[in-house]
């Protein structure tokens, strides 16, 4: 059960702390002070979810002291994050619980952009309902630190594929890293890719880790150095261990910045009304990119329940810009940014980087797809192309759910590559929802497609020519993604002038997510276009 009342937060030496007892476990949270402006530039998707499984139950002050003495608080502060302490409520402690306890813990943790004191408020954008308070953390960066009895619990129960409440619904919640110190049982290793930090364990017990793909043996824990050299490399994204990029080694630069914009009249989502506000961003580019003149810009908008680093690190835009030599700028907290303000951000970026004004592109995932569509609707003249994914929002309302302004684009064609997940629990493809049909018909009209969508309605989907889109493309292409055992099926549609500037794609075996394979194909198509 989520917390329906905000837990009492108190100041403590070096930060803030709070605790809450759930039905199956007690959670204590220490939020160390830091110098980051996390509300402007959100580090959440890079931040580790530091879970300390206490061997014996301790009080809150003792937990805070442990975090500081070990250096876990320093790690958390580096990423504007927290240290979470867990102990079972069951009589008998760790010896009385199984993997369902871990699932219970993960269920009470969410990644939402608005947060304070390590707590997020979950307000469902679609149902307009408040769903509770949750501890803040990135489930796919779960790093577990365990000792003695709790280490035995991890060794017996968590070194395998685990299912539970993932980012946007049911999914895999397997931890990225498990640190086990002073084991007394032989680990039951059913999964070899989970990163293992074995501390102070005998050679005999360590034999159980033979064949593990990612392992570090230590006599004694050195938390900060172990994290920087080993732990921080790993994330468990949708059931697959992935490694973080080393930008220095790759010859890349990451810039952190913000733009102060004038608040537009249609901005009703700011937490507090203001005449102007900050818009944070992270920019990524190859060293030396600007040596030969203006460069293409891709501006990215994240999903509603995540931050800019989702598109950058998880979807992989950093790698696509590295391979294709363009400037990628990921906008932070864009849910507080209107299309007008996004346009203003682009204008400022043009003064900070040598941007080719004829090659400005936009992309977005989920609610970020909505922001990308808003730019298509309101400011098409600034765009050479768009690459939205995983959301086909209604046309005749803005991202904020308000009626569109008189700026609604009806005539300016803009190249589009859109992709959505075939197995998503949200409406991403026309066969999944009426609003999706509305969006596709709108694009067909604005981009002046040769093929007509006029007779396509959601009610008659059982008789559609194409079971996903209603109408088949002029050409169809399939691209297999071996990393996810999925196929991207692309329908290319020609416009009346003979130019193919519209691509609608579906991804088999994909839920509500954004994958690098899809965005690489999107860039391959969209990058051929530039404004006249």
Pin down the residues of each PLM region:
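A domain-start/cap signature at the N-terminus of enzymes
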Residues: 1-49, 97-107, 118-128, 140-147, ...
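Short substrate-entry loop that stabilizes the transition state in hydrolases
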Residues: 36-47, 52-95, 289-295, 300-336, ...
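Alpha/beta-hydrolase
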Residues: 52-54, 180, 301, 389, ...
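Alpha-helical scaffolding within the catalytic cores
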Residues: 65-73, 182-189, 309-318, 345, ...
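Conserved acidic catalytic loop of the alpha/beta-hydrolase fold
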Residues: 102-140, 341-358
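A conserved short beta-strand
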Residues: 164-184, 381-396, 414-415
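Short beta-strand/loop motif that positions the catalytic acidic residue
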Residues: 197-199, 418-420
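Conserved alpha/beta-hydrolase "acid-adjacent" motif
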Residues: 201-205, 425-438, 514-517
């Amino acid at each position: 059960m989520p917390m329906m009342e905000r837990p009492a937060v108190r100041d403590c030496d070096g930060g803030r702390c709070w605790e809450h007892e759930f039905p199956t476990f007690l959670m204590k949270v220490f939020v160390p002070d830091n110098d980051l402006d996390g509300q402007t530039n959100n580090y959440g998707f890079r931040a580790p979810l530091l879970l300390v499984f206490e061997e014996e139950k301790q009080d809150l002050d003792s937990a805070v002291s442990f975090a500081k003495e070990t250096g876990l608080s320093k790690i958390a502060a580096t990423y504007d994050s927290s240290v979470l302490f867990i102990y079972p409520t069951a009589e008998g402690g760790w010896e009385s619980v199984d993997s369902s306890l871990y699932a219970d813990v993960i269920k009470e943790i969410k990644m939402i952009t608005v947060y304070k004191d390590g707590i997020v408020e979950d307000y469902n954008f679609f149902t307009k309902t408040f769903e509770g308070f949750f501890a803040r953390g990135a489930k796919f960066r779960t790093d577990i630190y365990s000792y003695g009895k709790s280490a035995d619990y991890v060794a017996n129960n968590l070194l395998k594929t685990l299912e539970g409440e993932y980012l946007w619904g049911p999914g895999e919640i397997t931890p990225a890293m498990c640190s086990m110190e002073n084991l007394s049982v032989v680990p039951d290793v059913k999964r070899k890719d989970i990163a293992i930090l074995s501390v102070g364990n005998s050679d005999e017990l360590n034999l159980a880790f033979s064949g593990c793909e990612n392992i570090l043996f230590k006599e004694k824990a050195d938390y900060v150095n172990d994290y920087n050299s080993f732990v921080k490399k790993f994330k468990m994204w949708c059931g697959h261990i992935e490694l973080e990029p080393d930008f220095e080694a790759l010859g890349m630069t990451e810039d952190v910045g913000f733009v102060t914009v004038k608040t537009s009249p249609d901005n009703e989502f700011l937490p507090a009304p203001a005449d102007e506000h900050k818009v944070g961003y992270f920019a990524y580019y190859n060293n030396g990119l600007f040596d030969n003149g203006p460069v293409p810009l891709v501006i990215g908008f994240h999903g509603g329940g995540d931050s800019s680093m989702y598109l950058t690190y998880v979807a992989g835009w950093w790698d696509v810009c590295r391979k294709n030599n363009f400037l990628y700028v990921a906008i932070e907290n864009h849910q507080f940014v209107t299309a007008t303000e996004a346009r203003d951000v682009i204008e400022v970026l043009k003064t900070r980087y040598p941007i080719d004004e004829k090659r400005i592109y936009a992309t977005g995932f989920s609610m970020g797809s909505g922001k990308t569509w808003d730019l298509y609707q309101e400011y098409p003249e600034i765009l050479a192309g768009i690459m939205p994914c995983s959301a086909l929002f209604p046309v005749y309302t803005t991202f904020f759910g308000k009626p569109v302004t008189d700026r609604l684009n009806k005539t300016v064609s803009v190249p589009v590559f859109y992709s959505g997940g075939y197995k998503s629990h949200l409406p991403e493809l026309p066969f999944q929802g009426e609003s999706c049909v509305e969006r596709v018909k709108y694009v067909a009209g604005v981009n002046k497609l040769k093929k007509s969508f006029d007779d396509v309605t959601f009610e008659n989907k059982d008789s559609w020519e194409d079971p996903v889109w209603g109408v088949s493309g002029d050409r169809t292409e399939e691209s297999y993604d071996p990393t996810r055992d999925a196929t991207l099926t692309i329908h290319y549609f020609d416009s009346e002038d003979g130019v193919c500037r519209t691509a609608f794609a579906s991804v088999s075996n994909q839920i509500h997510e954004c994958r690098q394979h899809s965005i690489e194909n999107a860039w391959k198509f969209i990058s051929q276009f530039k404004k006249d």
